[in-house]
């Protein structure tokens, strides 16, 4: 019934799209008018639009003309005309929503439309990409569109200096990665003057691959940290205890990836720790022993939860983490709270010191700083509820410009892993013999290497899968009665092994570019962990640019310098060869995505499917499933076993049935909901910290902006006096209960004042309020004399410097306390208390204590300071580490470039305010990326056209 109603009335998404069409028609109607404008007149439109804004006109009213201007600028600068569906995508982004646009639909060009419109108020627009290469490429390529309209474009990339970053953020449109933006925000809040800050606010941002950044990375905070003391021997000692614990000493929750000590485990670990004198006096869970217990729990996780070659690998005597979404190495990333050190101790590698958090923020809270936020991706609808719940972002699916020709086949489900692997190898052989390129998608390094070995090793294949293959024709005839028989006998299969193939996973990251480039060649077989290199096109027939570059490198290695004529001849030969191979691949059905198991999220499955059938090309995708796969084994064992028994499946049979599809979808929904709950729970805790973070950062900036913080210092001095007096003379206490000697000592230590407190206390009828008043007067008088000796200008500078440094020191200690409390607060649930409510209460108490310490430290330093010479300006901490991983690059993007392709060093800012690009005037083109289309309109890439002729600098 519902499907019939949808056919008649359309879906909600269809109705929203229909509402956009009148605006598209308006923009199309304006096209002839803008085509008639000269380059100067087109650029002058920006000035006109800004003047109209100043007079009170709204951005929405300007949208038809602004979009028409961008369309015309794109035609002139790039030779590209945004389609109607791209205009719709731009409208959705301008509304502050997420546009789901399939891969290959031109999201990069779509972003220019809302970017231009929202840059008109001159508050800056940020375009967020997933790596430096894309930020650089897009800023240079799309920057030519903005230059045609008189706007400036900047790019922020790893390794740039603060002045370069400041210049980039000052541009109308700034391209940057999510990591650079987040860390610049944190670093700005560690600066000691507003002039040193690089960002200028958070107005409007468009996030590319928004699902990856705002969902996949939401649980991982951005952290700036510094080194702490070396505790190598402590980690080693704790590590030696874990093998001594029996299985009755702990309980493992595979779904939650957690482990807890049982009552027997608590008793045993307490005994072991006492034997090694690692416990302070008292109970195991006394405050003094929390650190030891914490490290025991982390060591348990390292031994029982984290698996080598699945969660991490050992490379160059170091533990390198593996990204759960891409299966790629993440060099530079380290687990926090001592867990990474526990894994290092387990594996016997060098143990690196822990880091202390100096500043941190999650992407969830960073991107909620923006006044308006929008996003683009090819896969967002499955997470629409989360986008709206967390970020208040609606998701709209934009129609494709050409119909999708990909065929998504039903899943094939087997009872055992061996049966599944046999069917996969059989399918791969069939495709290779027909010349169809195959991309084999796996969820982990371990799974990719199993298939790799089965395709390479005859003995292993025979040992693991031989019993599944018919031995003779009679057996084969019997076997063919099954739902999906293996088509060949064992001798036939063994003749075909080894099967030529390539492996793309964390171990072979260095070869990624070449492997991806060749994945579309007829008969190519590429094994890849959940597609490393998302955003990299697999071109049917091969990659002409890469082959030409390889040929040039061979020529140079042989000591030859090819002429331009030779290069052109070779390029034509390569293109001709690739065109022929592409026809062969298309005839065989296009790229076949063969997935070896379902991922935890339907969205990840859709990303894998999206690797084929791009831009109207034919393609095919299918998932091969086993009941023993992790997803089904953990989340749907009973239901699937019942289905299998009901259907009476035999050995080697595959099933394709609606019941099975429903069970698979139910399992994925369970995992998606669990992960959503985890992210939502993380956000609830981080919101507590975020409120405190915003309060501290905002107050800190106020102090930086202010020329005079004397009133703040006076209030702190008064509060400190009140704290000291009330601590030693409690309110409503009798005089004989006063700690006068303690007060005198505290005043001497904090204020440097030797006051006659004993005499004051002996006075008839004196009260604590009067003693406080005398202490405050004496402190104010002493401080005034100190300020007069220093001079007002020097004193104001000293006050601000000490205040800012004290805020930083206390905030870092506060973060460390919050982290420690957060890791242990879950234990309160055993006392029937709500951990979140407990965290809120404890976090507030810690914040109050931090503020008390801050006031006391600032007061003490200023009261005791000596002016022998002017103090040096405060410096930022040295030896800091910035940590966050981009799932697509598989490494800490803030570290120095490591394995794999990285972006080239970029100029600090590309300011494009000069003459717009003209096809016949190379001098107007400015800096052009090598892989961008040549501005002359030839259709070639720049490096194959004018870039190869005039030797222009490469990007």
UniProtKB/Swiss-Prot annotation:
One of its GO terms (biological process) is protein import. InterPro entries: Helicase_ATP-bd, P-loop_NTPase, SEC_C_motif, SecA, SecA_CS, SecA_DEAD, SecA_motor_DEAD, SecA_preprotein_X-link_dom. Zn(2+) binds at residues 934, 936, 945-946. It comes from the Bacteria. One of its GO terms (molecular function) is metal ion binding. CDD domains: DEXDc_SecA, SF2_C_secA. May bind 1 zinc ion per subunit. Residues 885-894 have a biased composition (Basic and acidic residues). ATP binds at residues 86, 104-108, 537. It is found in: Cell inner membrane; Cytoplasm. It catalyses: ATP + H2O + cellular proteinSide 1 = ADP + phosphate + cellular proteinSide 2. SUPFAM superfamilies: Helical scaffold and wing domains of SecA, P-loop containing nucleoside triphosphate hydrolases, Pre-protein crosslinking domain of SecA. Residues 872-955 are annotated as: Disordered. Its main location: membrane. Disulfide bonds: none annotated. GO terms for cellular component: cell envelope Sec protein transport complex; cytosol; plasma membrane. Its cofactor is Zn(2+). It is a peripheral membrane protein. Its EC number is 7.4.2.8. Keywords: ATP-binding, Cell inner membrane, Cell membrane, Cytoplasm, Membrane, Metal-binding, Nucleotide-binding, Protein transport, Translocase, Translocation, Transport, Zinc. It holds the Pfam family SecA_SW. Monomer and homodimer. Part of the essential Sec protein translocation apparatus which comprises SecA, SecYEG and auxiliary proteins SecDF-YajC and YidC. Part of the Sec protein translocase complex. Interacts with the SecYEG preprotein conducting channel. Has a central role in coupling the hydrolysis of ATP to the transfer of proteins into and across the cell membrane, serving both as a receptor for the preprotein-SecB complex and as an ATP-driven molecular motor driving the stepwise translocation of polypeptide chains across the membrane. Belongs to the SecA family. This is Protein translocase subunit SecA. It comes from Maricaulis maris (strain MCS10).
């Amino acid at each position: 019934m519902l499907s019939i109603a949808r056919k008649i009335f359309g879906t909600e998404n269809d109705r929203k799209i229909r509402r956009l069409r009148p605006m598209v028609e308006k923009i199309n109607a304006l096209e002839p008018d803008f085509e008639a404008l000269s380059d100067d007149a087109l650029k002058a439109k920006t000035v006109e639009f800004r003047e109209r804004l100043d007079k009170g006109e709204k951005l929405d009213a300007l949208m038809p003309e602004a979009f028409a201007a961008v369309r015309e600028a794109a035609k002139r600068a790039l030779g590209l005309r945004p389609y109607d569906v791209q205009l719709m995508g731009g409208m959705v982004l301008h509304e502050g929503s997420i546009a789901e646009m399939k891969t290959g639909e031109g999201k990069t060009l779509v972003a220019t439309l809302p970017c231009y419109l929202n840059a008109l108020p001159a508050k800056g627009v940020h375009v967020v990409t997933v790596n430096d290469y894309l930020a650089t490429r897009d800023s240079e390529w799309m920057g030519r569109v903005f230059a045609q309209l008189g706007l400036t474009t900047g790019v922020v990339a790893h390794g740039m200096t603060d002045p370069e970053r400041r210049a980039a953020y000052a541009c109308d449109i700034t391209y940057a990665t999510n990591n650079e933006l987040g860390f610049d925000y944190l670093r700005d809040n560690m600066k000691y003057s507003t002039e040193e800050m690089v960002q200028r606010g958070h107005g409007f941002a468009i996030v590319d691959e928004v699902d990856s950044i705002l969902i996949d990375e939401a649980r991982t905070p951005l952290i700036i940290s510094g080194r702490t003391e070396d505790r190598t021997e402590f980690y080693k000692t704790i590590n030696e205890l874990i093998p001594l614990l029996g299985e009755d000493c702990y309980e493992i929750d595979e779904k939650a990836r957690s482990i807890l000590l049982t009552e027997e485990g608590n008793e045993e670990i307490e005994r072991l720790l006492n034997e090694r004198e690692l416990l302070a006096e008292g109970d195991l869970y006394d405050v003094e022993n929390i650190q030891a217990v914490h490290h025991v729990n982390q060591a348990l996780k390292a031994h029982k939860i984290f698996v080598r070659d699945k969660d991490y690998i050992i490379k160059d005597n170091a533990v390198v983490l593996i990204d759960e979404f891409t299966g790629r190495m993440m060099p530079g990333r380290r687990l926090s709270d001592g867990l990474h050190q526990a894994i290092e101790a387990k594996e016997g590698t060098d143990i690196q010191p822990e880091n202390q958090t100096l500043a941190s923020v999650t992407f969830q809270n960073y991107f909620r700083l923006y006044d308006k936020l929008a996003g683009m991706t090819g896969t967002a609808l499955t997470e629409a509820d989360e986008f709206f719940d967390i970020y208040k972002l609606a998701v709209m699916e934009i129609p494709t410009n050409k119909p999708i020709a990909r065929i998504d086949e039903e899943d094939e489900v087997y009872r055992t892993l061996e049966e599944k692997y046999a069917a996969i190898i059989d399918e791969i052989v069939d495709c290779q013999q027909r010349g169809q390129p195959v991309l084999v998608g796996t969820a982990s390094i371990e799974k990719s290497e199993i298939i790799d070995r089965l395709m390479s090793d005859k003995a292993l294949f025979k040992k693991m899968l031989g019993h599944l293959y018919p031995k003779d024709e009679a057996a084969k005839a019997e076997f063919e009665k099954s739902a999906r028989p293996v088509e060949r006998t064992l001798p036939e299969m063994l003749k075909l092994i080894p099967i030529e193939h390539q492996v793309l996973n964390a171990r072979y990251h260095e070869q990624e570019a070449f492997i991806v480039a060749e994945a579309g060649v007829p008969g190519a077989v590429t094994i890849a962990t959940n597609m490393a290199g998302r955003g990299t096109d697999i071109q049917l027939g091969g990659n002409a640019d890469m082959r030409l570059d390889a040929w040039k490198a061979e020529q140079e290695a042989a000591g030859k310098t090819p002429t331009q004529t030779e290069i052109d001849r070779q390029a034509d030969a390569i293109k001709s060869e690739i065109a022929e191979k592409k026809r062969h691949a298309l005839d065989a059905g296009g790229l076949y995505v063969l997935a070896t198991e379902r991922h935890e999220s339907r969205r990840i499955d859709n990303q894998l499917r999206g690797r084929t059938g791009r831009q109207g090309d034919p393609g095919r995708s299918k998932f091969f499933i086993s009941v023993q796969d992790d997803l089904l084994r953990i989340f749907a064992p009973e239901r699937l076993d019942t289905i299998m028994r009901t259907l009476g499946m035999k050995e080697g049979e595959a099933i394709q049935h609606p019941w099975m599809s429903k069970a698979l979808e139910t399992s994925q929904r369970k995992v998606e909901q669990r992960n959503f709950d985890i992210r939502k729970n993380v956000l609830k805790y981080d919101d507590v910290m975020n409120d405190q973070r915003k309060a501290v950062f905002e107050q800190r900036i106020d102090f930086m902006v202010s020329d005079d913080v004397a009133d703040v210092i006076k209030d702190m001095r008064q509060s400190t006096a009140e704290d000291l007096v009330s601590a030693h003379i409690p309110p409503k206490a009798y005089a004989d209960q006063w700690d006068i000697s303690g007060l005198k000592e505290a005043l001497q230590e904090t204020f440097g004042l030797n006051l006659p407190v004993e005499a004051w206390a002996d006075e008839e009828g004196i009260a604590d309020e009067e003693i406080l008043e005398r202490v405050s007067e004496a402190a104010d008088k002493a401080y005034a004399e100190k300020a007069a000796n220093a001079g007002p200008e020097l004193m104001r500078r000293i006050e601000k410097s000490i205040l800012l440094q004290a805020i930083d020191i206390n905030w870092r200690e506060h973060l460390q306390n919050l982290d420690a409390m957060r890791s242990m607060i879950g234990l309160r649930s055993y006392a029937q208390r709500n951990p979140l409510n407990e965290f809120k209460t404890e976090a507030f108490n810690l914040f109050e204590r931090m503020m008390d310490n801050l006031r006391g430290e600032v007061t003490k330093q200023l009261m005791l300071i000596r002016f022998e010479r002017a103090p040096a300006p405060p410096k930022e901490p040295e030896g800091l580490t910035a940590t966050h991983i981009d799932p697509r690059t598989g490494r800490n993007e803030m570290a120095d470039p490591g394995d794999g392709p990285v972006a080239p060093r970029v100029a600090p800012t590309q300011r494009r305010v000069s003459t717009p690009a003209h096809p016949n005037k190379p001098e107007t083109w400015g800096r052009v990326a090598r892989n961008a289309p040549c501005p002359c309109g030839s259709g070639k890439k720049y490096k194959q056209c004018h870039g190869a002729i005039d030797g222009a600098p490469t990007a």
